[in-house]
Amino acid sequence: MWSLLLLAALVGQGFALKNVFDMRIQCPHSANFGETSVSGYTELPPLSLQEAEQLVPESSCNMDNHQSLSTINKLTKVVWRKKANQESANQNSFEVVESEVSFKGLCMLKHRMVEESYRNRRSVICYDLACNSTFCKPTVYMIVPKHACNMMKSCLIGLVPYRIQVVYERTYCTTGILTEGKCFVPDKAVVSALKRGMYAIASIETICFFIHQKGNTYKIVTAITSAMGSKCNNTDTKVQGYYICIIGGNSAPVYAPAGEDFRAMEVFSGIITSPHGEDHDLPAEEIATYQISGQIEAKIPHTVSSKNLKLIAFAGIPSYSSTSILAASEDGRFIFSPGLFPNLNQSVCDNNALPLIWRGLIDLTGYYEAVHPCNVFCVLSGPGASCEAFSEGGIFNITSPMCLVSKQNRFRAAEQQISFICQRVDMDIIVYCNGQKKTILTKTLVMASAFILLQVSFHCYQGLPIAIAIELCVPGFHGWATAALLITFCFGWVLIPACTLAILLVLKFFANILHTSNQENRFKAILRKIKEEFEKTKGSMGCEICKYECETLKELKAHNLSCVQGECPYCFTHCEPTETATQAHYKVCQATHRFREDLKKTVTPKKYWARLYRTLNLFRYKSRCYILTMWTLLLIIESILWAASAAEIPLVPLWTDNAHGVGSVPMHRNTYELDFSFPSSSKYTYKRHLTNPVNDQQSVSLHIEIESQGIGADVHHLGHWYDARLNLKTSFHCYGACTKYQYPWHTAKCHFEKDYEYENSWACNPPDCPGVGTGCTACGLYLDQLKPVATPFRIISVRYSRKVCVQFGEEYLCKTIDMNDCFVTRHAKICIIGTVSKFSQGDTLLFLGPMEGGGIIFKHWCTSTCHFGDPGDVMGPKDKPFICPEFPGQFRKKCNFATTPICEYDGNIISGYKKVLATIDSFQSFNTSNIHFTDERIEWRDPDGMLRDHINIVISKDIDFENLAENPCKVGLQAANIEGAWGSGVGFTLTCQVSLTECPTFLTSIKACDMAICYGAESVTLSRGQNTVRITGKGGHSGSSFKCCHGKECSSTGLQASAPHLDKVNGISELENEKVYDDGAPECGVTCWFKKSGEWVMGIINGNWVVLIVLCVLLLFSLILLSILCPVRKHKKS
């Protein structure tokens, strides 16, 4: 019993889950002005016609549904049926039946309903029906004010027996509509449509609802007649009203027709040309069969005397809406026609209707929202890192190969923020955001954990550990050197004697071992010499009885006396006088070394090792003089090592450099040449002083700057590439003559039809067809669910260029050179010898989203005679008609006895876009940065360095040192501001105010330096007057005072950067890190090291004197501890 109840409960839950469907509403994340609403819809599975007539939508959303939708609406229901007399097959073999039916919640919107729902914060939830004679497929629509996006994340709509979960998805768009992965903002002005070259064009899905409203301004049939150029009469007495539309699921209401709004004009044109709009096919219904009964007329409403509406009766899967409104009456006669296609063709004047709901694509002019760069930062969180990315506009794409990037979005005004977790920090974190590669140096995060521990230790004074603990947390040798320096200063007076004592104990241990080993080896050598002399003079030293080899003469005599008597010569124990017995006894005898020890006592040992051991014992490791000497010496050595280890972090990417030369180059050779290659993303700066080989005091400054590679492509904008679903419909007719009917899919943008006429037997006729040999079949192919997915550009020509500037003394020249081109001046020649590239003429660049995110290179893109499934199969060119693909497959009509014929198509049924997505990894991709584009040209830079340039620089020897040695340009420096941190991998940015006098333009470099080392440089072209220069550097220490330097001259004052590891760690853009600076400056030597150490000590004293007091207190404590543990020895008076 209970098991059956449990089973029933589980089955009921499974059925409930099966009947839950999603409706996703896309919301831009920034509020805009106007009555903006968002909308969505969802297709539901079929239910019986009787159940469909009883549907009532219910909502659990916190916005109440509009009251007017709960009222009962009356429609004229038109159904068809076979006549009782089926003797002959003709157009009169079936008939229609009209009646009145009531619905509650059907999409029959009232005038000002959407506007009122916006002001009153109410929702509009309704449904539409696509029906045949037996069942209906509901489509639920929802329109809500944009405020709902901020108030709710999801809610439920009930439409018995279905439940629809409404999910509000915040897009990265600020106010625009998400299409092709980009944010499009339509422009309603007609002038923008007339000047299409100045605006972008996008295909946007639009949903329109007919509003019946009487009035002279709502004569919609008159507008249709005027738009189509037909000559219909009595339009004033026909239906009146308008369509209210929501564009792209996110817009203020658009009213059609409206002559002053281009959006309304496009919507109205779409309704007239394709009145059925998109079909309502569910997945797997793209291949279906219709049985067409034929054309028939009906009376709307059923009480009128004459028939006033034409319809086409069918049986099969319903694909289009069954609701419409009669065009011939101004009273608003609504129609519900299950199993019938109403005549929506507006080219005829009578017996037609207007669609009640229309859904389709329209082409609109407008602009795309700008894509802003991302900022990424991370903080330490447990064993990993907690990161956050934010952008001023929105984030269209964010991925990371080492992080779990979730979609935890937060929005603040127009800014979008995404939080995610990185589980590992043992390697640098790489994040791709908005087409940019960001690198977070995790060694800074690892330092933070140690720093936090130290900061907790000094909880009573939080500022104390800043200047010292951060130096300890620097990875590598510098951190260990800092620790050794601090330990020596604070506890050296205790640790030095303790370490010395430990060393002495170890030395004495080894000295004792060496002494013992040496004495043993010396004694063995004496015994060997004694034995050799005895054997030379008297013979063998072996006992004749026991055959034992003796070491001394005394031992041999004892053997001769005892072995004869059967006694042991060592312990005098009785044993049998045989060789075997005595040898066995000697192995266990404890006194065999007796004669050896007696001889060892007579040998005098050497005193060398004894003197060494005694010296170690007498060493005065407790002496204050010794401790002071070692303490001072260690502090000096450790300070030098500490300063040497705090070198700058070079900003050098991976590149091949064959250049030869140093900071100062004497011009002995005929020419001075550099030859190297480096990535396209790198910027190169080369600076040297060229000296006169005759007079070293005469020199000329040479400064060469080569910008990163720019790629410019002349392109042809091919338009928009569409994804689509291919439908195969079989339409069979067996009532009356074989007529070529106008089916709803004939208004699709891309369709093709193959007709088969009369059959000669029952082989293909279903049993419900009256007569024999009657029937014709139409096989229709058409594309629906068109969706723009990408933007392709065909490359006409491509150019790779770099801007090269040369400052030679006073001479300043610049030129942009292409590959295999040279820049020649009087003294220098700079050439790009070759470029390794992956772009070529004729390639197609495909952008699947914002162009800032990069694209895909297609070597084979279809431009003419395209087949469905090829790349570029369904295209919407700009300012040209829609291009449909060809369908090269063959049709086959499959016949079985007494069944409806079925069309078969053996061609490809998968769109080109879906094929590309399935094999996208096989295509070559590229990234972009600093992209600028029009319909005719695209310019960008390669952020990945995938391309390489071979550069050759030749400097002539013919230099007039007499005239060029004097440079009149005067540069003044002042440090204005600093951001960032010292000593970290992220670095700092120093803002310098640089003044230039005596010359109009000067190309030079400004460095960020402290007293000892320069940590970064920026090549800049100065103009006369004040210039602002921002320099990025990495390195330094807590005492570094960063100044702006030009050559050997620096600003009078410097600025100190923040301590690292205290704030969040920001990501570094690859573009900011891809630069090579080479000025041949000498490396930091011993003098430089001492300056650096002194600067650090002075920085500690000036910046945080409490630290110095604490260090001195620790030093005093170690001295007291020394006096307790190692008191001074008192000398007794003689």
From Swiss-Prot:
Residues 505-626, 1126-1134 are cytoplasmic. The chain crosses the membrane at residues 485-504, 627-647, 1106-1125. Gene3D superfamilies: 1.10.8.1320. A zinc finger (CCHC-type) spans 543-563, 568-589. Pfam families: Hanta_Gc_C (PF20682), Hanta_Gc_N (PF01561), Hanta_Gn-B (PF20679), Hanta_Gn-H (PF01567), ITAM_Cys-rich (PF10538). Belongs to the hantavirus envelope glycoprotein family. This is Envelopment polyprotein.
